[in-house]
Amino acid sequence: MSKTTYEEYLKRYGTLIYKNTGTSMLPLLKQGRDAFIVRAVGEYETCKKWDVVLYKRPPESYVLHRVVRVDDNSYDILGDNCIGIERNIAKDAVIGVMTGFIRNGKKYEADSRLYKLYVLFWCKPYRIRILMKKIWLKCSRIWRRKD
């Protein structure tokens, strides 16, 4: 029996609910606790800045990260807990857009006020957050060397 890809699933059902893995979308999504809800992206649809998108990263992995820049043919994408921006992700690599998530059995919509506050205070100042995280990582290495 063959495995169904995310693209095939979204094409067939239109929506995907899936448990995330990894720490790249902390604090929004925590592995083992939360599930995300993604809808298929329309053929000619352009995602917006701050959308969380599911995209295919060659050769065979899928990533759920946030759009931080929209260009004519590509996106720059960053995980909420990451310091490295993935640049020039082709628009056709994006297969879905997060419409919400489920935490402890409760559904949260991506267009809710609470979610928009999270985007305002956590996501929009991403350049400052990246700088602070890099400083923290550098200091941590220095402190470890002293021990």
Short names for language-model regions:
Residues 1-147:
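Extended hydrophobic leader/signal-anchor segments used for secretion and membrane insertion
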